[in-house]
């Protein structure tokens, strides 16, 4: 298990079904930065809508004397959990797809475990 104290603007977690939105925008930024700094190739990360893994990216991680910024991108596979613990004294929130109306409080000491659900989303066209 990897443990890291972080200060950031949040974390984006995408399903295969949701990888065409915010995740795609973040990856475009990563590719642009890698190209600008001659850091090599950053692949397109596209998964099928039925992909049984989650992908996460930390938004604007800020390294300091007390925080790290190494664990900023990864996957959560079947039977794995990503555990987040809030250090926000107040105004910490969890929300889905940019909709704050259905947000949940996520303040200091609260723990969130994220994994793959048994239920599968379906896209109807």
Where are these regions (language model features)?
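ATP/nucleoside-binding phosphotransfer catalytic cores, i.e., glycine-rich phosphate-binding loops
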Residues: 58-125
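ATP/pyrophosphate-binding catalytic subdomain of soluble kinases
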Residues: 1-53
């Amino acid at each position: 298990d990897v443990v890291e104290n972080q200060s950031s603007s949040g974390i984006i977690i995408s399903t295969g079904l949701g990888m065409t939105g915010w995740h795609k925008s973040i990856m475009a930024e990563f590719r642009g930065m890698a190209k600008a700094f001659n850091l090599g190739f950053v692949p397109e990360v596209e998964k099928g809508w039925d992909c049984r893994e989650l992908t996460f990216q930390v938004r604007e991680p800020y390294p300091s004397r007390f925080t790290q910024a190494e664990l900023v991108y990864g996957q959560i596979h079947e039977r794995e959990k990503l555990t987040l613990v809030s250090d926000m004294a107040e105004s910490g929130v969890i929300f889905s797809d940019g909709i704050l109306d259905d947000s949940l409080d996520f303040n200091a000491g609260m723990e969130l475990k994220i994994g793959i659900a048994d239920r599968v989303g379906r896209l109807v066209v």
